[in-house]
């Protein structure tokens, strides 16, 4: 199988040297991601495209899913690549691919040509289109809004017959821009904000301020791992977890109630700035949106930003909440956010919407900054690729098994699409299906006398979900790895 990768348009208008550098980086990124599951993946670089090929047709569906989620790809074409002798040979090859699919359909032929030939692109379109109309049971040629558009590309003596066109995610290739540190809470906003910078070519590292115990951290790790594995797996990134409960306790004791929200955000920015300094990251990313909550007025954001010299990037600053939720649904983080509790909102009962810097600084004078320094010094840094292994070592009581006992039930927690593509069949046993994003609410309704073995393809999500359920007090759960 072969695919032609078309570059994001903003790449094509760069200078020659920048374009070559971006294209070469995209080539490496595609190769890195595809070889996670197919070592035979090949990626060849041309001036205006990349050509991806593999002999392993069994990975076709994974190629389609993966290529659609790599930054820098505007769209990609499934192609049949061959040589040709003349116009009639091109027609015959095109009819072999498209003939049956044109039955009863209106169509047109669009051709793109590079190199020296004894025919023009228009002549190629007319010859092949006329031949298909004459020799196939079509509903006729329609140049505007046809049922099917047959796309051909001729490059010197090579013919590319395009059988399907798929949209990519656009943006710049990963690591063509500088790194950023995203303050990830697990909610709708921070996940979408992180995605925006992945798409723009930044390596997005994650900083998590834990306000809700192990369950909160497990939930946010799931979001970070999902974003990385889905859209950014070509490069390693770091996940930083900071226990912020001591900071919250100090704020509750020492800071005026109305100023608590702004002071908390300033403490988070201070801590994130130190983490960014440690990893030499020049910018922070948040999901803040002007006016969405009390701490996100322009006055308050200005006061919050004063505590760090890092650039604080807010890609959602003017987005409406319904648009953020819609984008979260599109990229796949909605289900995580819907089950993630909001911890920051309980801090202040009557929050200020126009913080005065001098008043905030006076309140912070009562704060013991040794507490902030301590929680940052004790921060835990994790290569996001190791999340599954780290969680397994962290909580020893989660049992993994490949053998089923009589009272054990297999619980497939994959999404419906993953399940349908690769069904789990265990001879003589039924398999229950509850997607991971519904497990937190649905698990308590299952019969408690049975033990449930959670299953997913790689074992990472099932391990994280088992940890979450253990934290909630459910002991009748294991991980199934056949």
Curated annotation (Swiss-Prot):
GO cellular component, one term: cytosol
Pfam families, sorted: Rhodanese (PF00581), ThiI (PF02568), ThiI_fer (PF22025), THUMP (PF02926)
Major subcellular location class: cytoplasm
Keyword Nucleotide-binding: yes
Domain Rhodanese, chain residue ranges per copy: 404-482
Disulphide bonds in the chain: 344-456
Annotated THUMP domain residues: 61-165
Entry EC number(s): 2.8.1.4
Origin superkingdom: Bacteria
Subcellular location: Cytoplasm
Any one biological process term the GO annotation gives: tRNA 4-thiouridine biosynthesis
Residue numbers binding ATP: 183-184, 265, 287, 296
Pathway, per record: Cofactor biosynthesis; thiamine diphosphate biosynthesis
Gene Ontology molecular function: ATP binding; CCA tRNA nucleotidyltransferase activity; tRNA binding; tRNA-uracil-4 sulfurtransferase activity
Residues forming the catalytic site: 456
Catalytic activities: [ThiI sulfur-carrier protein]-S-sulfanyl-L-cysteine + a uridine in tRNA + 2 reduced [2Fe-2S]-[ferredoxin] + ATP + H(+) = [ThiI sulfur-carrier protein]-L-cysteine + a 4-thiouridine in tRNA + 2 oxidized [2Fe-2S]-[ferredoxin] + AMP + diphosphate; [ThiS sulfur-carrier protein]-C-terminal Gly-Gly-AMP + S-sulfanyl-L-cysteinyl-[cysteine desulfurase] + AH2 = [ThiS sulfur-carrier protein]-C-terminal-Gly-aminoethanethioate + L-cysteinyl-[cysteine desulfurase] + A + AMP + 2 H(+)
Keywords assigned: ATP-binding, Cytoplasm, Disulfide bond, Nucleotide-binding, Redox-active center, RNA-binding, Thiamine biosynthesis, Transferase, tRNA-binding
UniProt cross-references to InterPro entries, sorted A to Z: Rhodanese-like_dom, Rhodanese-like_dom_sf, Rossmann-like_a/b/a_fold, ThiI_AANH, ThiI_fer, ThiI_N, THII_Thiazole_biosynth_dom, THUMP_dom
Family statement drawn from the similarity comment of this UniProt entry: Belongs to the ThiI family.
Known role: Catalyzes the ATP-dependent transfer of a sulfur to tRNA to produce 4-thiouridine in position 8 of tRNAs, which functions as a near-UV photosensor. Also catalyzes the transfer of sulfur to the sulfur carrier protein ThiS, forming ThiS-thiocarboxylate. This is a step in the synthesis of thiazole, in the thiamine biosynthesis pathway. The sulfur is donated as persulfide by IscS.
Protein's name in the database: tRNA sulfurtransferase
Organism of origin: Aeromonas salmonicida (strain A449)
Highest classification ranks of the organism: Bacteria, Pseudomonadati, Pseudomonadota, Gammaproteobacteria, Aeromonadales
Gene label: thiI
């Amino acid at each position: 199988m072969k695919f032609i990768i078309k570059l994001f348009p903003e790449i094509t208008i760069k200078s020659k040297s920048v374009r070559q550098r971006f294209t070469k980086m995209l080539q490496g990124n595609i190769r890195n991601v595809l070889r996670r599951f197919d070592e035979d993946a090949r990626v060849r670089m041309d001036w205006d495209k990349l050509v991806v090929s593999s002999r392993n047709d069994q990975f076709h569906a994974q190629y389609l899913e993966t290529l659609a989620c790599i930054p820098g790809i505007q769209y990609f074409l499934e192609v049949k690549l061959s040589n040709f002798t003349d116009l009639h040979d091109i027609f015959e090859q095109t009819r072999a691919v498209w003939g049956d699919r044109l039955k009863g359909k209106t169509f047109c032929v669009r051709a793109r040509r590079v190199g020296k030939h004894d025919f023009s692109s228009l002549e190629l379109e007319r010859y092949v289109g006329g031949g298909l109309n004459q020799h196939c049971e079509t509903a006729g040629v329609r140049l505007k809004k046809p049922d099917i558009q047959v796309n051909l590309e001729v490059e010197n003596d090579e013919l590319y017959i395009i059988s399907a066109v798929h949209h990519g995610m656009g943006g710049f290739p990963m690591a063509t821009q500088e790194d950023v540190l995203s303050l990830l809470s697990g909610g709708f906003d921070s996940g979408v904000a992180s995605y925006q910078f992945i798409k723009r070519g930044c390596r997005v590292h994650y900083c998590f301020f834990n306000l809700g115990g192990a369950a909160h951290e497990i939930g946010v790790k799931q979001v970070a791992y999902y974003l990385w594995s889905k859209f950014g797996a070509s490069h390693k990134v770091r996940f930083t977890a900071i226990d912020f409960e001591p900071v919250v306790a100090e704020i509750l004791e020492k800071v005026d109630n109305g100023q608590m929200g702004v002071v908390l955000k300033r403490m988070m920015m201070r801590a994130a700035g130190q983490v960014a300094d440690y990893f030499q990251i020049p910018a922070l990313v948040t999901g803040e949106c002007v006016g969405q909550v009390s701490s996100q007025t322009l006055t308050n954001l200005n006061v919050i930003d004063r505590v760090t010299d890092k650039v604080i990037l807010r890609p959602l600053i003017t987005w409406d909440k319904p648009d953020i939720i819609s984008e979260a649904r599109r990229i796949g983080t909605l289900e995580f956010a819907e089950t993630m509790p909001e911890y920051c909102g309980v801090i202040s009962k009557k929050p200020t919407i126009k913080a005065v810097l001098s008043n905030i600084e006076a309140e912070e004078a009562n704060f013991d900054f040794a507490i902030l320094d301590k929680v940052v010094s004790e921060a835990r840094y994790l290569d996001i690729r190791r999340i599954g292994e780290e969680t397994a070592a962290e909580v020893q009581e989660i049992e993994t098994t490949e053998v089923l006992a009589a009272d054990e039930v297999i619980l497939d927690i994959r999404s419906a699409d993953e399940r349908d593509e690769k069904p789990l069949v265990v001879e003589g046993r039924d398999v229950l299906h509850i997607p991971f994003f519904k497990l937190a609410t649905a698990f308590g309704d299952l019969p408690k006398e049975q033990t449930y073995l959670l299953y997913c393809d790689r074992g990472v999500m099932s391990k994280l979900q088992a940890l979450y359920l253990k934290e909630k007090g459910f002991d009748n759960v294991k991980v199934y790895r056949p």
